[in-house]
Amino acid sequence: MKNVTDSFVSLGHWPSAGSFGFNTDILATNPINLSVVLGVLIFFGKGVLSDLLDNRKQRILNTIRNSEELRGGAIEQLEKARSRLRKVETEAEQFRVNGYSEIEREKLNLINSTYKTLEQLENYKNETIQFEQQRAINQVRQRVFQQALRGALGTLNSCLNNELHLRTISANIGMLGTMKEITD
């Protein structure tokens, strides 16, 4: 406990410009460093992730708006088709003597083609939404993976020293020598 209070007291007294050294007191340095690093990560990481998600949300909303506009166009086409249907029905009354079944077939074909068009537009809207969502998810995953990889590389680089590096190389050379003896 005395070391902790001494470290906080010593924060007010900076060493002179000529001295440099390592503080080996773990209790005095790590909580401060960790809190600073975590604070920086949370502060900057939250903003980046929030901006990325906001951008994706705007793109998805724009896609939905475009799909709604297409839907509005389809509804307009449906109204035109209904108008044509009414016209066809009027003509059907006039030409009933000439053949009612042919007009009925045309009416059904017109209705079916209109419903197919609406179905296609709805499917296109749903596919577009799913595609945009998947693309947003993939980009978020990629950014998170890149950040995690950078953090892991930073941790590895900070933990590696020359002695550990030489031991790892020696162990790998030994394993390769053993594998060569086995294959010979």
Swiss-Prot record:
Chief localisation class: plastid
Source organism: Solanum tuberosum (Potato)
Other notes: In plastids the F-type ATPase is also known as CF(1)CF(0).
Assembly description: F-type ATPases have 2 components, F(1) - the catalytic core - and F(0) - the membrane proton channel. F(1) has five subunits: alpha(3), beta(3), gamma(1), delta(1), epsilon(1). F(0) has four main subunits: a(1), b(1), b'(1) and c(10-14). The alpha and beta chains form an alternating ring which encloses part of the gamma chain. F(1) is attached to F(0) by a central stalk formed by the gamma and epsilon chains, while a peripheral stalk is formed by the delta, b and b' chains.
Subcellular location: Plastid, Chloroplast thylakoid membrane
Transmembrane residue ranges: 27-49
Pfam families attached to this UniProt entry: ATP-synt_B
Keywords: ATP synthesis, ATP-binding, CF(0), Chloroplast, Hydrogen ion transport, Ion transport, Membrane, Nucleotide-binding, Plastid, Thylakoid, Transmembrane, Transmembrane helix, Transport
Molecular-function GO terms, alphabetical: ATP binding; proton-transporting ATP synthase activity, rotational mechanism
Family: Belongs to the ATPase B chain family.
Protein task: F(1)F(0) ATP synthase produces ATP from ADP in the presence of a proton or sodium gradient. F-type ATPases consist of two structural domains, F(1) containing the extramembraneous catalytic core and F(0) containing the membrane proton channel, linked together by a central stalk and a peripheral stalk. During catalysis, ATP synthesis in the catalytic domain of F(1) is coupled via a rotary mechanism of the central stalk subunits to proton translocation. Component of the F(0) channel, it forms part of the peripheral stalk, linking F(1) to F(0).
InterPro entries: ATP_synth_b/b'su_bac/chlpt (IPR002146)
Protein's name according to its UniProt entry: ATP synthase subunit b, chloroplastic
Membrane topology: Single-pass membrane protein
GO terms under cellular component: chloroplast thylakoid membrane; proton-transporting ATP synthase complex
